Amino acid sequence: MKKRTIRSIPQDRTSMLERPALERARDFAEVSCGYTLDEAVRESERCLFCPDEPCVRACPVGINIPGFIRLIGERDLRGSYDVLTDMTLLPAVCGRVCPQEVQCEGVCTVGGSLEPVAIGRLERFVGDRAIAGGWSSRPDIVPAGLKVAVVGSGPAGMACAADMAKAGCAVTVFEAFQQPGGVLRYGIPDFRLPNEVVDAEIATLTRLGITFRCNTVIGRLFTLEQLIDEMGFAAVFVGVGAGAPTFMEIPGESLNGVISANELLTRCNLMRAREFPERDTPIGIGRRVAVVGAGNTAMDAMRVCLRLGAEEVACVYRRSRAEAPARAEELHHAEQEGITFHWLTDPVEILDDGKRGVRGLRCQKMELGEPDASGRRRPVPVPGSEIDLECDTVVFAIGTNANPILGQTSKLRLDGRGYIAVDEELATSIAGVFAGGDIVTGAATVIQAMGAGRRAAAAMKRYLGLADTDVPYALAGGEGLFGFAAEQRDHAPVRFA
């Protein structure tokens, strides 16, 4: 293959077809339509196949990005899928929801001169082709004679479960809700991540022999100690996420019509409240909705409210648009669909309509001061700038905290924020119990949670004697990938009992 240069590759990033905003804003069908084969091949021709692979180093799970893209260009889609699934069994999910613009695409060499290679779109394309073709990637597995429990079936739990199953362990995943998937199932709407895609990716895990046990709340039905001492699990991974909603503690939060984005999305996505009364779960959304926050969850909540029939939906955020933590694509989609944005606006009180309902949101205008610990400029109140926004529903999407159930019912040591404390191997204060993902770090991305799950699996294999003890190990955030040094990203030497 002739060496590619910036001048020799297609200069423009291949666009992806999207449904018209006015059409899609009233239904839950997926917004982005994905690449065709010809579009994917054309975009693959923009990759320079850099020898230092900055995109691979920026991926929390170490996907061989040039490898899978090269095979797309050769139209070997099954080979491309096999390369992807060496490191992730969720390509159709990650291609849709990972923030590639601040990870792999953010360091793409092409992006220094042109728009970066659309790595996420290409990953989604291959994942979708695999689902449509019924492909699966099942390695030769030698039974290790060990049982492993995974608590939580979100991204961290699924990644850990997959690696432990590949190592020959009999893996049982315990899920509190009635369906597996964690935040992929209850936290992300169908128009961004269809349930059918989640179902298909989970089916890939079941083909590895992984068992999902739903409607089982560890910490209530069983303790972590019981899993090991009484149920025969040799090791346990806790990846339950951090789903307890955060509020502002301002007057009026107890009024009818105030809800967290977590509850809104869970009712709509998991319990299918949007199909009420055909489904049993109702959800009360008024004509005018104010959503507080500007992250991805806030964007999802606003766009869901539109689809539930709200006539006006507004975003209220105390910083400017430039500081909004939402992905650029999600913010763009929300703007296209008619969301109103009140930047530099901070709620101070929810107004009572006299009947314990909401009639408005009193806010104070802000201006940006000096940078705070996050590196963003701190919002400072502007004296005498209060305004009242008319609304009958207020949705809070300002972050989450750790669910306290596990910490209250076992000997787990927690940190000062209420998250599970772990050492550098992600081991907890209970022997044989490991933890990772949002329940350790606080809210993060899907791919970061998957990276934590893989890193924990590597540590669990060492703990169980299934991996060589001299495998190089790297701390999270270092040059290594999911617990192995960079040079070990393709595989680690493993032995079976």
What do these predicted regions represent?
Residues 24-43, 63-96, 113-142, 268, ...:
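Ferredoxin-type iron-sulfur electron-transfer modules in oxidoreductases and energy-metabolism complexes
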Residues 254-286, 371-443:
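FAD-site-proximal beta/loop scaffold in flavoenzymes
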Residues 146-172, 298-306:
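N-terminal Rossmann-like FAD-binding beta1-loop-alpha1 element of flavoenzymes
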Residues 68, 92-94, 101-151, 167, ...:
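FAD-binding core/adjacent interface of flavoenzyme oxidoreductases
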Residues 439-464:
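A conserved FAD-binding loop/helix module that cradles the flavin
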Residues 170-173, 177-212, 302-349, 470-485:
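Rossmann-like dinucleotide-binding cores of NAD(P)H-dependent redox enzymes
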Residues 36, 207-229, 277-281, 344-392:
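A structured beta-alpha segment of the ubiquitous adenosine-cofactor-binding alpha/beta core
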Residues 1-35, 336-338, 346-359, 369, ...:
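Mid-to-C-terminal Rossmann-like scaffold of FAD/NAD(P)H-dependent oxidoreductases
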